Amino acid sequence: MSFSDDCFTIKTTVGKEYKEPKGRNGGAMLKLEYDKKEIEGVIDKIVKKTMNMDLTWDWPCGVAYYGISDAYEKTGKKEYLDLLKDRIDELIDLGLPKVWTVNACAMGHCLITLYQATGEQQYHDILMSKIAYLRKDALRFGDHVLQHTVSANNDFPEQCWCDTLFMAAFLMLRVGVMEHDEELIDDALNQYYWHIKYLQNPSSGLWYHGYDNIAGDHMSGIYWGRANAWAAFTMSQVGGILPQCYLYPKYIDVAGSLNEQLAALKVY
């Protein structure tokens, strides 16, 4: 890091600099310099490598294809959409799971992109079948908290996991906004609210992976890195996709939780 009279600079991972010049009142003005072509090249490599993976209709595929969906939306490269569409159509033709789980609902994220980009009804139908499952059939406990499920069996009775925020709550929120469904939005925010209450340590600000409502404990009690990533990412997205988010009381809990978590991660 180097300092000067008007700014300081930080080298980024792509070899450019982060500059923070002073504003008119002497305050810092954020400015990020980066090599767009280099970043797009990295995105391109990741997309192509991901599409060469043998993934099935479950959460790893859902997370990976959410990334490809986002790459398409951010870059506008139709090639990414075509790759995604071809693979999803292939998986649909091979046959979808007979029973949905919370984990399998992660595939709903790429279905949103495909439906919005193509208008093809089959993507909307499958997406809404996942939402119907989450609303009516998914196991819940306490104040309608989703139990994390990985199969048709009741593998983890009355357990909530951070994973559910990405696989289900974030999906419900996105679909609720897309469909102008306030009941679904409220349900999604309720999931955020209770996962915060159950999984975030109020003393440290960090998140546990899971909570067992029957035993009344956090099982291993560790601050799992990926669990904190599920929480941080999904909470960071709420304000950007929920219109007039400040009108929803539970959003205040989401924003506060995220701030506390990021402050904790900064010094952890």
Language model segments and positions:
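Glycan-recognition and catalytic cores of secretory/periplasmic carbohydrate-active enzymes
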Residues: 2, 6-268
